[in-house]
Structure formats: structure tokens, C-alpha cells
Amino acid sequence: MNPAYRKAMLESEIQKLLMEALQQLRDPRLKKDFVTFSRVELSKDKRYADVYVSFLGTPEERKETVEILNRAKGFFRTFIAKNLRLYVAPEIRFYEDKGIEASVKVHQLLVQLGYDPLKDKEKKEEEKKEE
């Protein structure tokens, strides 16, 4: 099996397991409905899994959410160890994913410049319907 393919499959499976574990986590401060693990990146030796978290909320809420998840990383690692056949379960490290925030800023800048990709797409679709 291609090592890159195996790594991608493991990352995907770990991401699914983390979402399951999140639903079982009992922390009243955590708003589970708004937390998404956008991607998982395994190190080459598969001992570390960097998990990028996207969360709708204020910057303070996002920072607090990442801190809560990092405090519970033992729970997540145990859950992965029980549900995934690996020699060693990877150590989990949570980071805030700033990709969504950056894409919103880019969209706002485009709108300020007079170009709105969403409206242009709608116009093109309407023109196709008229033809």
C-alpha cells in the first residue's frame, strides 16, 4: 500500500473518531454543535496528530475552545487507541484553523473592490436559464 495513501486514510479515520469522541465528551463549557475538526495532519512517524479546529464564535471563544480540547487530549487519544489498530496512538495537538476566517476576509476584500463572486455566479446561472 502506498504510504501517502495509508497516511491520508489514517488522517481521515482519526478525524471521524475525534468527532465521535467529541460527542461523548462531557464538558458544559464546550459548545459541541459549533466545533468542527477541519483537518488532521499526522507526522511522518505517526506519533503526533495535529488537529485543526474551526469554530463559529468570537476570538475569545475560539481560543477557549482550543484550550478545553487540549486539556481533554488524553480522552481523545484513549478513544482513538480503543477504536483504531495502531502500534502507538498518536499524541493529539489541537490548533485553531484560521482558514475559514481568512477566506471570509478575502471575500470581504473582493466585495470592497466591487467584485462579488457569489453574485456573479448567480448572474451567470440566470443567463444560462434565459438561453
From Swiss-Prot:
Principal location listed in the UniProt entry: cytoplasm
A GO cellular-component term linked to this record: cytosol
Intracellular or extracellular location(s): Cytoplasm
Keyword presence, Cytoplasm: yes
InterPro entries named in the record: KH_dom-like_a/b, RbfA, RbfA_dom_sf, Ribosome-bd_factorA_CS
UniProt entry keywords in alphabetical sequence: Cytoplasm, Ribosome biogenesis
Species name: Thermotoga sp. (strain RQ2)
Family designation: Belongs to the RbfA family.
Lineage of the organism: Bacteria, Thermotogati, Thermotogota, Thermotogae, Thermotogales
Superkingdom of the organism of origin: Bacteria
Span of the signal peptide: none
Entry's Gene Ontology molecular function annotations: ribosomal small subunit binding
GO biological process: maturation of SSU-rRNA
Record's subunit section: Monomer. Binds 30S ribosomal subunits, but not 50S ribosomal subunits or 70S ribosomes.
Protein name: Ribosome-binding factor A
